[in-house]
């Protein structure tokens, strides 16, 4: 469910723009450690990046879930107002933007840990390379 995804720091497609344009994410990089020939230093840095990313996205996700529960409760209790709807939905939107930025920034940070040939291999292994050699 969306709630579980938010609480678990799941990607939910938030980094698709990065992923499809040559910016690998740490979870898939770790899954491809051997074929990408990651060095020990790269693997350790990627594990650290993923751990920090999950911590941050779970924290933001929990905040989103809490606000959504407040919104639900306001409707359930018949205590909702136009002003409160505006406040809560604005807070949720800000957090969702922060969450997406966190996912995208993690892909940027991951890419900086890799060599150009590793990024190219990642694209191919993930099936993003077309016969013309371009990605998507």
Predicted regions and their residues:
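Charge-rich (acidic/polar
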Residues: 1-136
């Amino acid at each position: 469910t969306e709630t579980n995804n938010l609480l678990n720091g799941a990607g939910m497609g938030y980094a698709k723009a990065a992923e499809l344009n040559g910016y690998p994410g740490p979870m898939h990089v770790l899954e491809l450690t051997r074929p990408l020939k990651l060095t020990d230093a790269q693997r350790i840095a990627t594990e650290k990046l993923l751990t920090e990313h999950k911590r941050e996205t779970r924290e933001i996700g929990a905040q989103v879930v809490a606000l959504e529960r407040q919104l639900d409760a306001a409707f359930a209790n018949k205590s909702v107002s136009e002003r409160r709807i505006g406040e809560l939905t604005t807070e949720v939107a800000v957090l969702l933007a922060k969450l997406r930025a966190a996912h995208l920034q993690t892909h940027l940070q991951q890419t900086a840990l890799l060599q150009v040939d590793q990024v190219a291999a990642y694209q191919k292994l993930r099936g993003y390379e077309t016969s013309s050699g371009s990605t998507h």
